[in-house]
Amino acid sequence: MAYTDTNVTGNREDLKQLATVIAATQAPVCGLLPTRQVNNKRPVVLMDSLASPVATGHIEGTATDTGVDKFAAVGEYTGQAQRLVREWQVTKEQEAHNSAVVADKAGASEKALKELMRDKETVVCGDQGKTADVPGTTAGVTAGLGDITNASNTDFAAAYRTPAASIYSGTKADFDDAAFNAVLASMFGQGGEFLDLHLVAGTGLRSHMVVKFTRTAGAASQIDYNMNGTAVIPYTVEMYDSDFGTVKIINGNPACMPSVDRGYVIDPRYLEWGELYGEGSEEYEGRGVGSKGACDLYGTTLSQGPNGLGKVEFSDEA
């Protein structure tokens, strides 16, 4: 296990590099999000939009010095940082044993870090709204994607909320490529730019898409299996090319998604993680018991415009 940096005075080890590796495999949503440093537990994010196009011509001789406020539509979102902690401990007796499961403080710290990253993924993917912290009384809770993409979320100005049309909320049986394309059409309509998106899909949604998107009316007959003359049967959907852009489809961690049927359509330009401090591990005085410590992180989800995001949330979600 390699640490990127060690602060001897504070006895805190920076585990950012290892955390990045873990995120790529066990926390796919966190792995997608850009991270930026914030210095406030309630950072404010600003968002803006362009005025609707007009085709009105200018009349010769009329003045152009009336002035138009170009920042009247600026909206803001206030995040709420959440600290996540995973404690670890290894007794002297455990360290003395030579077993298949190596019990030492490095292994304990790494295992705690993996658990911490799954906790972070669960928070980011959750449906919870933000909760303001009260020191000594209430833990701060950051908003999850399920709440951020709620069409009626009043934490965002109405113009920047995720449109209802960008959320598929019908039954699972009715979700097909036409329904998914309607979600993408709504997202495209927000900015008019060719989309480059990621769909993080629960296992149930992913399996459903394979059946609905690769077979005729859900029947047993296949549409197109043999590609480039190979005999491989690609029973999967990894890329969806639509009229409005490309969607890369990846599996959500089943332990961290709010439902196996849930899916988030993410444009990383409109979602990020605000970090007060990153993943690290501290070791404490053991007083004869052995080695003990904790891994923690402190940050918040932030969105520069949920209107650029989409969601699949079946009405009969498992």
Please provide the spans of the model-predicted regions.
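Flexible, glycine/threonine- and acidic-rich loop/arm segments that mediate assembly and lattice contacts
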Residues: 1-318
